[in-house]
Amino acid sequence: MDKISIQQLAETTRDLILNLILRINSIVEEIENTNGQEVFSNDRLNFILDDFFDLAEAIDIIQQQNSSISLEELTEKLNMLYDSMKAKDKFFFKDIAEFELKPLLEHWAKTIQFTGKH
């Protein structure tokens, strides 16, 4: 992939990451302000998981240009999130989303903006 394409992919991926962070905040808030069990029965989780798969595809390409981004980290955290969903454990889900996944995405949002610009 050429430099311009990598840069465009990085910009699009950063936008997706920022969107995912907002959606994680919304889900965490829903869990905190309600009994939170319905979080596992609505389509929002399916949509956000689809977007995480898209993110994983982009990260797989970007990590070749930016060594501070690793698909392995995302996979590990998504596996933990999936385990919490299978167990319908809203507190584990909230903790993984808020304290594991969100900080990783915030770090990537800062780091990824420089990918392809050198």
What are these model-predicted stretches?
Residues 1-118:
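C-terminal-biased regions
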